[in-house]
């Protein structure tokens, strides 16, 4: 059975979607807020998420960015925002598709089927990563060095997650700036130098001679297990 999570603050829309999706034989879970949606995504492990952008405790774009740190589950945005810039921002953050309200349920169901077919051929990132004496649980957003818990800021954690999910790959400064801070920050390379320094101080055994958070001079950075 296909499990679908609806993250939407309007009860009438959630009820309408639930009726249609359960009629197709799917199991439906609901969340009214960004934070509840992330919790449901981590615990229920749905096969697909339908997401509204205008949530009461935050923007759905932030939901997508946080989710993509540890999950590749398909996300279909269902939003009253119809501007091209909103669609581009959601897709760049990691959404798989975008449908503007008002919408036709038949079109949504068709797009849902396409997203599920596409996702069935992909492999989700491992939410648990270990290197040296560090253990990172991306889904729970918990990090330990040995027995000690390590506290990261939201930006530090987002940068770490992008690096871990691309372990072994060289990521350009522009790629990292876009994925962590957004497209308006792609010229601010000093952000990366500062936050990579923070990660090395907190997670490397010898920050002056890093083994895991490697600088690729003139290009960007690479995480090595």
Swiss-Prot record:
Swiss-Prot/TrEMBL GO biological process terms: regulation of DNA-templated transcription
Keyword Protein biosynthesis in annotation: no
Modified residues (4-aspartylphosphate): 52
GO CC annotation, single: cytosol
Post-translational modifications: Phosphorylated by KdpD.
Record domain Response regulatory: where: 3-116
The organism's place on the tree of life at top rank: Bacteria
Keywords: Cytoplasm, DNA-binding, Phosphoprotein, Transcription, Transcription regulation, Two-component regulatory system
Gene Ontology MF terms in the entry: cis-regulatory region sequence-specific DNA binding; DNA-binding transcription activator activity; DNA-binding transcription factor activity; phosphorelay response regulator activity; protein homodimerization activity; transcription cis-regulatory region binding
Ranges annotated as DNA-binding: 126-225
Record keyword tRNA processing present: no
Compartments where located: Cytoplasm
Chief localisation class: cytoplasm
CDD domains tied to this protein: REC_OmpR_KdpE-like (cd17620), trans_reg_C (cd00383)
InterPro entries: CheY-like_superfamily, OmpR/PhoB-type_DNA-bd, Sig_transdc_resp-reg_receiver, WalR-like, WH-like_DNA-bd_sf
Function: Member of the two-component regulatory system KdpD/KdpE involved in the regulation of the kdp operon.
Protein's name according to its UniProt entry: KDP operon transcriptional regulatory protein KdpE
Organism per entry: Escherichia coli (strain K12)
Gene: kdpE
